[in-house]
Design a protein with these regions (language model features):
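Class I S-adenosyl-L-methionine-dependent methyltransferase catalytic core
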Residues: 1-212
Length: 212
C-alpha cells in the first residue's frame, strides 16, 4: 500500500472529498470513461489502461460531485453513444447537445470505419450557457491513444460555468481539478480508489478525521 492509500482509503469514505476550489461542487465536469465496449483486440483500449463495465460507470456519483446547477460533458464513442444518454440521465443530467470531433485519419470500425468521437453535453438545474455561438463540431488532429483535443477544454470553459473538474484525466490542466489513475488526484470518490492524491486533499482529510 502506498503513502496516499494509507492516508485516504476511498473504499472507506461515505461521501466525496473535494478541495476548497470545488466548494459547492463543480459547475462543469468532463468525464472520459474507459468504456469496455468494443475495446478488445490488438488495437483496443484494453492494451492501454484498465477498462470499466457499464455498471461501474453508472455507479460513479457524478451528480454529487457537481453543483446544483451544472453541466456534464461525457465522452462517448460511436459504439457507446446510446449508453451515454442513459448514463447522463442516471447521473441526474438532461442530455442537451452533441459535440462531434472529426478526426483527419481513418479509424477502426465493425461496419463503417470511424473518423469521429463525440462528447455529450448534459445539464442539471438551471446551469447557464455562457455563449450561444459555439458550433457542435470541430476538426482536430489525432494524438496518442485517448488523448483528447486541448481545444475541448477551451470550449467547455467558453460554454459552461466553473469551477471545472475532469474525471479520468491523464494530465493536469491549469484552473481545473482532476481525478484519475494516471495523475495526482484532487478529489476522492467513495468506492473508486486511485493511486495518488494531492497533498492538499490529504491534509484536509487528516484535519477532518484527526489523522496524523
Amino acid at each position: 500500500m502506498d503513502f496516499d492509500a494509507k492516508k485516504i482509503d476511498a473504499m472507506n469514505i461515505n461521501k466525496p472529498l473535494l478541495p476548497a476550489s470545488l466548494k459547492g461542487g463543480a459547475g462543469a465536469i468532463i468525464v472520459d470513461p474507459p468504456w469496455n465496449i468494443q475495446q478488445s483486440g490488438n488495437f483496443g483500449a484494453i492494451n492501454h489502461y484498465n477498462l470499466m463495465t457499464l455498471e461501474q460507470i453508472r455507479a460513479l456519483p457524478v451528480g454529487s460531485l457537481c453543483a446544483e446547477n451544472a453541466h456534464c460533458w461525457l465522452w462517448v464513442t460511436n459504439a457507446t453513444m446510446e449508453y451515454g444518454f442513459e448514463i447522463l440521465r442516471i447521473w441526474g443530467f438532461t442530455p442537451r447537445s452533441i459535440f462531434t470531433w472529426f478526426k483527419p485519419r481513418l479509424g477502426l470500425g465493425v461496419y463503417l470505419r470511424g473518423m469521429t468521437e463525440h462528447i455529450l453535453l448534459g445539464s442539471k438545474g438551471k446551469a447557464p450557457v455562457k455563449v450561444k455561438n459555439q458550433p457542435n463540431f470541430g476538426v482536430f488532429p489525432v494524438q496518442e491513444h485517448s488523448h483528447k483535443p486541448e481545444e475541448i477544454y477551451n470550449i467547455v470553459e467558453r460554454v459552461s460555468p466553473g469551477p471545472y473538474l475532469e474525471l479520468f484525466a491523464r494530465r493536469p490542466r491549469y484552473g481545473w481539478a482532476a481525478w484519475g489513475e494516471e495523475i495526482t488526484s484532487d478529489i476522492a470518490i467513495p468506492g473508486f480508489p486511485v493511486p495518488k492524491y494531492s497533498d492538499t486533499l490529504i491534509k484536509d482529510f487528516q484535519k477532518k478525521t484527526g489523522g496524523v
